[in-house]
Amino acid sequence: FPTRRSSDLMGAGALVQLTCNLAAGLLIAGTSVAAAITSGIAVGFLVGLINAFLVIIVKIPTFVATLGTMFVMQGVTSWYNDGKALTIKAIPGFSVLGQGRIAIIPVIFLIVIAVCAVLHYFFKHTRTGLRMYATGENPAAATLRGLNTKKYLLLSYLLSGLILGFTGVLQCSYNYGASAITSGMDFLIQALSAAYLGSTFSKTGELSVIGTVISGMFIAALSNALIINGISNQQISGVLGIILILSILL
C-alpha cells in the first residue's frame, strides 16, 4: 500500500509463496480452477485478518507481528510442499491468467494494470481510500482528526491479504506451479524497492500506486537484464538493496 508503514510488507513474499504453493497443490490434486483461485485468495484474506488481530487487538508491534506470521507461513509452505517444487501442466481457464495473450499483450499485464487502476482510484478518489491512506501515513494525526484508525487498519490488512493471495495465484499460473523456495525475501526486497523508488516521482516524496507500478516495471526489467548477463539472484538482491537505500535517501 502507498504508505510509509513498510513493516507491513514483511510477510508479503511469504504469503505470495504460500498461496502459490496452495493453488499448485490443489490443482495437482484435481481441484477445480475456481476452487484453487478462491482458496488462494481466501488464505490471503485469513492471513490479513490474523495480522490485523495481532496488531490491533493484541497490540503486538507491526514489525514483530508480520515477522512472526512470515516465519509461520514459511514453515507451513515447507510442510505443504515437503521441500519440493510443485509443477502443473497447462490447465484451461487457469494457465490463461499467467500465460495467455490478447493480441500481443500478456493477460497478466492487463490484470495487473486493471487492479492498479482500481487501487489508484480507490486511494485518490474515495473517502474510505483517503482515510486508509491517512491512517497508514500517520496514525497519530489520523486519530487526532477523529478517524477510526482501527477500522481503517483492519481494512488495509484485509485488502493487502486479498491482493497478495491473488498475486500468489497469478504467480502459480505464470510459473506453471510453485518453487520449493520459501523465503520470499526476493519478493520483499522488490516490493520495498518499487514502493520507495516510486516516491521519487512525487515532489513531496509521496508514495503512490502509479509511481510504484512504474518503478516495479523498471525493477523487473533491470532484474531480467541482470539475469541475462549472468548475474545471480543473490547479486541482484544486493543491487536492489542499494536501490532501496538510495530511494529512501532521495
What are these model-derived regions, one by one?
Residues 1-6:
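Short, small-residue-biased leader/transition segments that mark boundaries at the very start
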Residues 7, 29-30, 57-59, 203-206, ...:
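Helix-loop interface residues and adjacent transmembrane-helix termini in multi-pass membrane transporters
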Residues 9, 117, 137, 143-151, ...:
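Cytosolic-side transmembrane-helix boundaries in multi-pass membrane proteins
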Residues 20, 70, 74-75, 109-120, ...:
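Hydrophobic core segments of alpha-helical transmembrane domains in multi-pass membrane transport
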Residues 31-69, 114, 215:
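Alpha-helical transmembrane segments within multi-pass membrane transporters and channels
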Residues 58, 62-125, 152-155, 174-180, ...:
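Transmembrane helix-bundle core of multi-pass membrane transporters
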Residues 118-158:
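Membrane-helix/interface signature in polytopic inner-membrane proteins
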Residues 164, 175, 179-238:
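Transmembrane alpha-helical segments in multi-pass inner-membrane proteins
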